[in-house]
UniProtKB/Swiss-Prot annotation:
Disulphide bond pairs: none
GO molecular function: anthranilate phosphoribosyltransferase activity; magnesium ion binding
GO biological process per UniProt: L-tryptophan biosynthetic process
Amino acids binding Mg(2+) 1: 93, 226
Taxonomic placement: Bacteria, Pseudomonadati, Pseudomonadota, Gammaproteobacteria, Pasteurellales
Protein name: Anthranilate phosphoribosyltransferase
One Gene Ontology CC term in the entry: cytosol
Keywords: Amino-acid biosynthesis, Aromatic amino acid biosynthesis, Glycosyltransferase, Magnesium, Metal-binding, Transferase, Tryptophan biosynthesis
Catalyses which reaction(s): N-(5-phospho-beta-D-ribosyl)anthranilate + diphosphate = 5-phospho-alpha-D-ribose 1-diphosphate + anthranilate
Cofactor note: Binds 2 magnesium ions per monomer.
Binding-site positions, anthranilate 1: 81, 112
UniProt source species: Histophilus somni (strain 2336) (Haemophilus somnus)
Amino acid sequence: MQTEQLISQLFDGQHLNQEQIQQLFHYIIQGQLSNEQLAGVLIALKFRGEQTDEISGAVKAIIANAKPFPFIDYPFADIVGTGGDNANTINISTTAAIVAATLGYKVVKHGNRSVSSKSGASDVLNALGIKIDLSAEKSKQALDNLNLCFLWAQQYHLGFKHVAPVRQILKTRTIFNILGPLCNPARPKHQLLGVYTPHLLKIYAESALRLGHQHSIVIHGSGLDEVAIHGKTDVAEICHGKIEYYSLTPHDFGFTPKPLETLRGGTAEENAKILTALLQGKGKDEHNQAVAMNTALLMKLFGNDDIKANAEKALNIMANGKAFETLNQLKLYQ
């Protein structure tokens, strides 16, 4: 009865407070809603617009129901986007995570299969021969030894299986595109978070702040949930309990703008070849630039404020092929 009351409130256009949404999402993750009820909830939230209370409450419910990940006693970050920008770009965040790890920064990348593009993080990792469903213990070992591990959302959030069929049928952005990046089971307090619309910047930053993030950056890059090589990137930076809003262009990273079309990706297999070329120092200039710019902001979360210098370091580590060694070492974890 309580579930029906909460759903009814949503259908009436009412906002749920954090406690109410946390309760509703507990029921969702436990599989207590029918597909029809769940589709109704997702559509109602989408058309009415999600609020900070709802996002933070839903994240808390999902994390509370997740399989645990070993405690990490050193600084680490995540780089992840909401997806749903329908740009079908190459796998920039995944490549940036490998580059940052090669530079010595600890990265726990949380990812899933694609919902609205051809190749999500898990899709391309599979194509590269990387085991995406490693045990939590082996993933922690990879993080300890290689500065990097990938956590597959479906392995830790078993309740997502109740949601996946409805998301596939709807084939559109839902609150789960918004929630996913904030639900890393390692519970990072430092994240580079890409969002598919500038309208999400403020609400996403406020949600991250409410969830206890120490230093995170939310970005929207002229239509992308990545730093833009083709124009302006809007930024909301959470640091020391405050949110600062500003914008960046490729010039701030030491580059000139490039056409977005140069970042078009393909299937997981095609994107895996592009990613491999990048890490071997054989990538296209535009691809190198995109990865370097995103890596530069990721490095900022570790206290490296000079993003132009950060981007140059990222370019150099790709050029010398050391990042490809990191990829090969990661393949050994089975």
